[in-house]
């Protein structure tokens, strides 16, 4: 065990609570000591929602430790059932309360006798899985539970819809731009003539889960959450799924072609090629922008990408393939799925880093000195410290990445947002040169008393001649660095030797 200053993926119970609180009219009871109950505060702070977070903590305190938890946990479940009248109550321990080794399944069976709603124990190993893995498992568990229940009651809808339809799986609370991505994918499906059968788990009710088999196929845009559910549905109902993330022009087209293939295989003849061409050439600005002179200014610039598997892999491909940016390092904190990530990004970057240690990523960024970083909130902090611009492309994120405006990352509108993010993350060439020549209004350290190009130091004629050989757009920088070097050493005149020594000291 080690003390973590920063965790990219939280503990398992956070994943379970994210799934439970994404559903409509589902309540979660967290069997935990005080200190593990920060989910409510985190969600109500970050998500722009009016409703309270449907999570209650059944506190493990001294009394519980001396008498056992059953009475308290069962009372809390029955009380919440009476107060909130949910369709389902999910009970989850945390890694701390798991140490008690209590028979929570027995508590659930006991509570089910008195509660009117369904009660389910989240079946997750809290020491083996992190937030994302636990979320994936909990979603599959809830879907499986209600499909079995519907089958038992004889109301499972297995007949396919008349028109092609899709289940969108993996949209959760606290996900990275999930609400915007969901809206964009609904628009995309409408343009393609595909009805949305169900969105899981965001805003779905558990009663609707019996309708899942009606859809012609499932779309899982995020690799972290939803894939286990899609695989289960494929085994159970031979329901195909598409797991290509439609992020960037190339991958969006590939995702649409895969959906076309799935529909054609089921006897529905569609051809989306004209739609792809129309969107790529005329609707999405990204393809046009990537050929413009503005984007060509970015060609060959160095970048570092780090995030979850879905966003880091997609972003690496977009930067390298669509914008000509040199991705020196691509990394992920999803160590459990490292092989997939390596296979996806190896040909698009120089180096692959798979780590949960924020220090290792910070050290790699400092060593590489990229022109821009694309990462999580943590990489944003690292960028601020090193004075390197950073675009946030993956969770974990802070409040500014839960925007009120419409900012999807998926689909064709997502390509525009990404192009803006990439372009605005790099310091523009002319801006850079003008700041160097004339000095900026936000210089962090004052090199001379003013920001004019007048100097209080004497320049020897040989040094002045050498300075004049330096290209104009960096001459001011060289002059300031040399004068700073001379001033620090108490020199009144700058000779050729001083100039060379300054150059060596700066490492130019």
Curated annotation (Swiss-Prot):
Broad EC category: oxidoreductase
Domain of life according to the entry: Bacteria
Reaction equations catalysed: chlorophyllide a + oxidized 2[4Fe-4S]-[ferredoxin] + 2 ADP + 2 phosphate = protochlorophyllide a + reduced 2[4Fe-4S]-[ferredoxin] + 2 ATP + 2 H2O
Pathway field: Porphyrin-containing compound metabolism; chlorophyll biosynthesis (light-independent)
GO terms (BP aspect): light-independent chlorophyll biosynthetic process; photosynthesis, dark reaction
Keyword annotations: 4Fe-4S, ATP-binding, Chlorophyll biosynthesis, Iron, Iron-sulfur, Metal-binding, Nucleotide-binding, Oxidoreductase, Photosynthesis
InterPro entries linked: ChlB/BchB/BchZ, LI-POR_suB-like_C, Nase/OxRdtase_comp1, P-CP_red_C, Protochl_reductB, Protochlorophyllide_Rdtase
Disulfide bonds: none
Active-site residues, as the UniProt record annotates them: 294 (proton donor)
CDD domains per record: Pchlide_reductase_B
Positions contributing to substrate binding: 429-430
UniProt: [4Fe-4S] cluster binding residues: 36
Cofactor(s) needed: [4Fe-4S] cluster
Free-text comment on the cofactor: Binds 1 [4Fe-4S] cluster per heterodimer. The cluster is bound at the heterodimer interface by residues from both subunits.
Any matching Pfam family: Oxidored_nitro
EC number from the UniProt entry: 1.3.7.7
Record-linked NCBIfam families: DPOR_BchB (TIGR01278)
Subunit: Protochlorophyllide reductase is composed of three subunits; ChlL, ChlN and ChlB. Forms a heterotetramer of two ChlB and two ChlN subunits.
Function as written in the Swiss-Prot or TrEMBL entry: Component of the dark-operative protochlorophyllide reductase (DPOR) that uses Mg-ATP and reduced ferredoxin to reduce ring D of protochlorophyllide (Pchlide) to form chlorophyllide a (Chlide). This reaction is light-independent. The NB-protein (ChlN-ChlB) is the catalytic component of the complex.
Family named by the database record: Belongs to the ChlB/BchB/BchZ family.
Protein name: Light-independent protochlorophyllide reductase subunit B
Originating organism: Synechocystis sp. (strain ATCC 27184 / PCC 6803 / Kazusa)
